[in-house]
Amino acid sequence: MSTSSFVHLHIHTEFSLADSTIRVPEKPEQAHPKKAKQANLLSRAVELGLPALAVTDLNNLFALIKFYKAAETVGIKPISGADLLIAEPEHPPWGMTLLCRDHAGYLNLSQLISRGWLEGHRPEGGVAVHPDWVRDHHKNLFALIGRHSLAGQLLAKGRADLAEQQLADWQHVFGDGLHLELTRTGRDGEEPFNQFALQVAGIRGIPVIASNDVRFLVQSDFLAHEARVCIASGRMLDDPKRPRTYSEQQYLRSSEEMAALFADIPDALDNTRTLAQRCNIEMRLGTYFLPNYPVPNDETLDSWIRKQSHEGLEARLLKHPLAPGQTREDYVTRLEFELDTIIKMGFSGYFLIVADFIQWGKQQGIPIGPGRGSGAGSLVAWALLITDLDPLPYNLLFERFLNPERVSMPDFDIDFCMERRDEVISYVARKYGRERVSQIITYGTMAAKAVVRDVGRVLGFPYGLVDSVAKLIPSTLGITLKDAMGEGETNDNASAELIQRYQAEEDVQELLNLARQLEDLTRNAGKHAGGVVIAPNPLTEFCPLFAEHDENGRGKNPVTQFDKNDVEEVGLVKFDFLGLRTLTIIDWAVKAINKRHARACIDPVDITALPLDDIPTYKDVFASGNTSAVFQFESSGMRRLLKDARPDRFEDLIALVSLYRPGPMDLIPEFTARKHGVQETIYPDPRTKNILKDTYGIMVYQEQVMQMAQIVGGYSLGSADLLRRAMGKKVPAEMAKHREIFREGAAKGGMDAVKADEIFDLMEKFAGYGFNKSHAAAYALVSYQTAWLKRHYPAEFMAATLSSDMDNTDKVVGFLDEARNLNLKVLRPNINHSAYMFEATHADTIQYGLGAIKGVGQSVCEAIVKERLHYGPYTSLLDFCTRVTSAKLNRRALEAMIHAGALDELGKNRASVMLQLPEVIKATEQMSRERESGQNSLFGNADPGTPVIQLDLPECEEWPLTRMLNGERETLGLYFSGHPFDPYRKQVKELVGCDLNTSALERILGSQQRGNGEKRTWQPEVNTILAGLVVSVRRKGDSQVFVQLEDGRGRIECSAFSDALAEFGHLLTRDRILIVKGGLREDEFNGGYSLRIRQCWDYAQLCTDYAQRLLLRVDLRTSHAWERIDAILARYRPGNTPLRLDLLLNSTHGPVAGTLDLSGGQSVRIEQSLLDKLQKDPAVSKLKVKYTPPWVQ
């Protein structure tokens, strides 16, 4: 620590979440001013020459590890502390600042903060600790009491005597660790408290310290700080009623400024330095603390993992064939090498812990993925049942997972069934102790679009202005305002219109300038998707805990206050329990298949033992691009790729999963051409053939780069992994060193420097985007399993797929289309046949799930099914309502089921069932009341399932088809009894030439491609004309509208922007049939296709305006034919479309054909109702409208 006489001991950072704009560097090196992306606490402290700092965020230690590491990097002493809100029934909540004297103090503070989050939730929000808790955990902590304390509150109320007694009480607790905080930031009440504090300090010998209660870095940040406070509190900056709690003086002042500010109280300055010298926390970073895994008494962790691994390998090899070219001895040698490495690095316990909870999960029937990440390259992991993919057949490398030349913690990422993942986490908590197991925190930040909207709101700007600016920010993941303004490293994401508006409009300048000051600040805390830590001791001995609260105000589901990187820094071992919905789909499908197999006495399907060379799966699913709903291969782009590549072996799937990413995607045409012999496969060196043969001479995987370094450059695989990492970082000095090593190794194999450099350059190029083969192989196995199920058991697979996304109507509709493409029958929901989920009732039939009806909850569905299974089918609406309790079955749910067609069996028709509903509900409510009061005379004591009352219920004619279809659309998200577009289909298709089904749209885009493995020539958009019924309209401000078109064969989302909206916006309304012209493109983000509208026409108006002639063939020999036809035509006159009638008449010489043209006053208006009436007349045998559409004029 330098000789400066002042140290800031009270600083809030962004991690206080509501009242600070001070950034904490994410990486230690960003503490240097020249390396900081934006000014942060440490970079500013370096500029000011501050010797030490204390971070004291409100009720948390979120920032501690990041702050600690960054401070040490630049030689600033880090002091750990926190502001605590303290609450007791007799007084309003008040504040106290605690600083850690040492590591023991840190543990006490950690305990105290954790207790606050677990037990101290306040009804009005936030948490507070009780004063007694502070007394229980005060040791090795220093306390700062200022004007926000209870003493400050009492003083403000004129009770100096009670205020002094308060300080005396805390002096008794903290002794010489108590300090009184003096501030001079221009806020109300400061000077009276300062004078009081100085007086008490003199009397009681309590030291005073100077503080600036820091909230922002520089004085000019005050507006941004106030904006942040307003965002958090939901207020506006110019709201005269909002509290003005802060002042523009609360910035990180220099020591000189503080010295001038407190020149009259030099002790207050000196005492900060003295206190800082007494704070000597030393965080124990970089050492791992594994939980204690129990082994038998006569075993050690190392002997036990060896024993378990060898036994596991033997069991595996009894069921699985050896890899081609490998012997049993090869397997044992590889196993021993891995075990030696694991034991030497001290990770036996880690492997055993992971194996234990995975094996437990499998014993419980919980679906678990075959592997994820580089862990799939470990033979020990396969032997211990951690993974389900033998690494040897696919040349997967253990060193990619655990490098003996680079000590780092192994990291198994485990995929679990989404439905049952929490069961495994609960098992781990029970086994190791709930106080030692926790999930991990994650922090949300103020992202570009969101912060613009937030700032616009607190500035009081019109919504239209703010919305229009936010929409100009590209939707690229992780984009910053700097990128959008063209100030990033590249201009790829620059928005020209945003830049233009920023330069031209003062309001936009103000909005974006303020938003950029707040962008990327931490704004909230949540739970990491899958991270779980297991500690050898209670977690609070390593870090504090954070928790949301339940309805009783107690903390629930605690998480660590350190994020996934920081928990590892303090030695906690992280395990990733990830949820993968595909595993749930596979599990549901296999259970349904085996249920059917059991009824038919057929052996069950074992999804883990599938042959990976099933020809129908490759031919009918992968090579044909029939991969909708197939894991990783669903997108339209991937389906096109599959049709080109025509994979016919598992290795191809691994490669395609790895290649279908930005960067390596450019290699796909070459890969495809080489696979099919259109191009020659060339290897950089003959020795690399075995490494590259599965990918036809192309480097696709990181493992291939490592093996090239080993075979050509003489590296060990451990060293090769270090080379791969170095190539990814592209540090010139490090690369030059490795190039020389590679040359020397290659020379030993007889290769000259020129050729060695050529291969090194090739490796360096591919290392930049090479994929992890272990991960690709494990996930390709899951893909293959879904494809195999789709090919051999399509009904069960599609039923499971539909069930997995029942709450997502758009996905349900898409999957139903795919089911029909597979020639599966989908039966409407039916209370006498449907379960909660979709079910395969036969090999070619799926029964709609009741749970997919909007407005019908799971508990209702389960009650319906349970009652039906116990007491038989429902026979009437009354029977149904009396058997399913009203508490679960309300009127809204009943109406939804009627509209969905689920109650069709219970009455004459839907209209009748709906008509009967009020009387049935009234009767069942009466029955319920009388049963509750014990009056059984009316209803008797009938057994469940038997009618208990008879009503004379009315019936009526069925609703019109349009009403039925609308009801289905509202409750199911789709039309079941037909489609409103059906009457128009023939005429519209003659106009536009195609439907909206996926294959038709693929053909349109596919016409832009050259085949035979040549490089694609895809255009960003393909101009086309489509038509459909508008089923939804979604507006984004005044400049963008999204409409979804359907035609009963498919659907597409169309977008219209300001240029099109000005001319055609009035046409974009629901239930209108539109013909649209625009740019068709593949929607890689959401899957499927989208179209940007440039022109559109109302179909009905187009018929009227552009029909050139109506052609009719009429048989006048039928009775009164002409009278009927003429009467129909008369109702559509006057009009602009002439007619040509091909007439068939009787004459004395037999049938005679003739033609009659009608025009002028005999012309008609072309409307769909006219065409419908004419088509229904028995005398009309042919009808056609000739158009001259506007797009061909």
From Swiss-Prot:
InterPro entries, per the entry: DNA_pol3_alpha_NTPase_dom, DNA_pol3_alpha_thumb_dom, DNA_pol3_finger, DnaE2/DnaE/PolC, DNAPol_HHH, NA-bd_OB-fold, NA-bd_OB_tRNA, PHP_dom
Alphabetical keyword list: Cytoplasm, DNA replication, DNA-directed DNA polymerase, Nucleotidyltransferase, Transferase
Keyword Transferase: yes
SMART domains (UniProt xref): POLIIIAc (SM00481)
Subcellular location: Cytoplasm
GO molecular function, one term: 3'-5' exonuclease activity
CDD domains for the chain: DnaE_OBF, PHP_PolIIIA_DnaE1
Chief place where the protein resides: cytoplasm
EC number: 2.7.7.7
Catalytic activity: DNA(n) + a 2'-deoxyribonucleoside 5'-triphosphate = DNA(n+1) + diphosphate
Function: DNA polymerase III is a complex, multichain enzyme responsible for most of the replicative synthesis in bacteria. This DNA polymerase also exhibits 3' to 5' exonuclease activity. The alpha chain is the DNA polymerase.
Complex formation: DNA polymerase III contains a core (composed of alpha, epsilon and theta chains) that associates with a tau subunit. This core dimerizes to form the PolIII' complex. PolIII' associates with the gamma complex (composed of gamma, delta, delta', psi and chi chains) and with the beta chain to form the complete DNA polymerase III complex.
Protein's name in the database: DNA polymerase III subunit alpha
Organism: Xylella fastidiosa (strain Temecula1 / ATCC 700964)
